[in-house]
Amino acid sequence: MPPPHRNHNFRPENVLKRAEDLIAVDKREAALETLYEFITSKRIRYLQVEDLEPIALLLMELAVDLRKGKLAKDALHQYKKNVQMSENGLESVQVVVKRFVDLAEKKLNDAQAKADIKIDQDEDEDLETSQTPESILMSAVSNTDTADRTERELVTPWLRFLWEAFRAVLDILRNNSKTEVTYSTIVNQAFQFCFRFNRKAEFRRLCELLRAHIQTVTTQPKTAGTTNAIDLSDSETIQRYLDQRFSQLNISVKLELWQESFRSVDDVHTLITASKKTPKPVMMANYYENLARIFAVSDNGLFHAAAWNKFFNLYSQSPNATDDELSHYASILVLSTLSIPQRSSNSNETVVDDHRAKNAKLSSLLNLSHVPTRDSLLKSIVSRQILSFVDPCVKKLFDVLGENNFHPLTIKKEIAALFKEIEADKDYKHYIKTLTEVVSVRIFQQVSQVYETVKLDFLVSLGIFEGTEYTLSALEVENLIAIATKEGHLALTIDHESGVVTFKSSPFEDSLSDSLTSRLQISPAELVRSQLQKFAYTLSKTVDTIDPENARRLEASREAAVKRAVAGISEEQEEIANRVKVMDERKRVIDVAKRKQDEEAARLKSERLSAEQKAEQERMLAEQERRSLEKLEREKHLIREREKRKIAEEINAKGIIKIDLDNLENLDTDKLRIMQIEQLNKDKKNLEEKLRALSKKTDHTERAFRRYELQYLEKDAEAQIEQEAKNYELVKANKIAKAKKDFEEAHALKERFTRLVPDYSEFKSEINAKNKDKLKQLQAEAKAQLERAKQERIEQIKRERIEELAQRKREQIQAEQEEARRRQKEEELAKLKEEIRLQREKDAEMLKRRQNVEAEVASRKAAITPAAPAEAKPMTYAEKLKLKRQQAGRS
């Protein structure tokens, strides 16, 4: 590892000082580039985090001021990569990213305050979409005020910058247990950003980003080498993720992004299922309330009411619930339950074949074991006495729609009055539409039991509730009748020519009336349908009366069948057990095969991904190298052009020659310099010739001037001598007068002081007499103090000398020990070298003897038989060892 701070220019304090100096001279981009190069360098891995953090913070400030989002993102990634293995590296990263986001938010707030506008809530602009030429042209020719466009240009870039900052920071902090608290904080800030500025497109992208992060957490392999991995089994971690998803759900509902809200509900339910800890009741109540709103938007009345039912179960247990709130939510629960449309008897009320999976999914979101029904919800309301909390008008509506109090021809006015009263509350008002349709269909069903034919106008009038804010028109009522007939709630035909409605009832089909609808009377079709059942019952009673033994025979046969079943139950149980074993074995074999197949697929996928990543890395490295070379060539070319242009401008500025700055392609710096030098040499030669001629002319002129001025110089010298003599006499007289004056003043002062000398001497003697003892005492103390100081200094010098001698002795001993160890190592090394040399000599001698022996053996074999000589067989290790011992014995 290289020592830290080896290069003076690489020290953090020097880099920081350099950046501050550049900022002071208003070169912020240069300072940013300096800090960026330092932060992204791999050499900072060996520096202290405390030294790097101020540099990273200053870099973030400059990047935000200059709006360099991509540079800041890359710097943050590199900073995390370089310091994350340090002890406090990740804490420093969190401080830096928080500072980055805070600065971006502050800039956005300042820009918005400077623009002094409110962000247009209705304009859903995508922050990731850059301006197109068409949009620029449209903004230029539009009638929008120029000041408004300028103000928007101030705010929108900072909106985009802050959004990119959120994305970059979340990508840096994701999937790390040490940064999950800061990650959660940034997520909440991003949610508030989307809600504050109504950024629906960005909110969708943010939700997808968070889902990708949690998907990575759930699918990442749990290996021992994984550091700082997110543990979803930890209660605090799962609670943080739940808080994030609940915030996401609340914001999506407030932004009216219902599809995203449903996905958020699914995310919350997945986390709740994975969590070992039950969420807080307040959070679950909020969950069910938002789910009810989502179901209301999707027109799913059944699950809308079921969600309000789950919400009220939790809310009614809250100690903070007031009577008004309980009454409000209970009324909503009852109204939503009454608004559930009834289903016909020819379809399964709980599970519709086309929506089986959907209903099961929605039931699981509500934590229900089975699909709810209208009947079960009504029974729940009655059994839990929820009607005691509801508003009086809602309770009265529930009683009116009861099974025994529903009269189709007289109930219309009463229901209309209740609807008018319910419409006064804005939260109850939106249930009137579905209640109107449900009540109308039920009225039509009751009428179909009483009448066979009615007038169409009469039937339509039964579905129009006058006096309410929401009422159906005649065409809408007719459409409702057609839909009810299509769904199987009614069986009728409409003759528009005569305006007559005919109710149909086939005796060979199931009743089309809903099973929950009370019957006013039994229709002829019902009588025909039950005739066969009554006939069978009568025949059974007749047989029992004619032949009393028939019952006993049936009982005996039943007992015999039971005995046979009991006798064969053990064999059947054994067969079942064997079948279970076979099935388990088959299942185990299938599981093993599937697991092997999955492992093989995972291995192949991992290898493929590794190969793709390696190829991608190689491609990126090659691309990066190519771009670097191209950038270097461009920079070199640009530098050459700049230098060429600069030289040409200097030449033009000096006026040496005139060069066309727009036509420099065929010229390089060397040619320009040669042209400049040639022109300078030419100018120099011309100047020298001019100077030579001028100097020759100047010599003759100067000689004439000097001859003419000689007569005037002599006269001037005489006048100057006379003037200097006068000046000397004047200065001399002034000095003598001043000296006399000073002497007289000093003599007078001496006489004045002489009169004071006797008094001064007497006063001095008195003072000396008074302070004589004190002066002696002070002198003695000073002398004693001086002696003590001398003695202490002597002792200090002795101690320092002793310590110095001891230190020298220790250093000498240490040096001797080091020298001894060095000599010992040298001796051992020399000994080892000597042994190696001797061993090599022995090996050489052995090789020579072996060659002699082999030659002797070969000569003997050649003498015995003239056959072709065989190749020398290499000696084994045992033969070599034996030969070595023989040689050692001979020596």
UniProtKB/Swiss-Prot annotation:
Subunit structure and binding partners: Component of the eukaryotic translation initiation factor 3 (eIF-3) complex.
Job of this protein: RNA-binding component of the eukaryotic translation initiation factor 3 (eIF-3) complex, which is involved in protein synthesis of a specialized repertoire of mRNAs and, together with other initiation factors, stimulates binding of mRNA and methionyl-tRNAi to the 40S ribosome. The eIF-3 complex specifically targets and initiates translation of a subset of mRNAs involved in cell proliferation.
Gene3D superfamilies on file: 1.25.40.860, UVR domain
Gene source species: Meyerozyma guilliermondii (strain ATCC 6260 / CBS 566 / DSM 6381 / JCM 1539 / NBRC 10279 / NRRL Y-324) (Yeast)
Start-end of Low complexity biased regions: 860-874
Subcellular location field: Cytoplasm
Signal peptide coordinates: none
Main location: cytoplasm
Name this protein carries in UniProt: Eukaryotic translation initiation factor 3 subunit A
Pfam families per the UniProt record, alphabetical: eIF3a_PCI_TPR-like, PCI
Record family assignment: Belongs to the eIF-3 subunit A family.
InterPro entries registered for this protein in UniProt: EIF3A (IPR027512), eIF3a_PCI_TPR-like (IPR054711), PCI_dom (IPR000717)
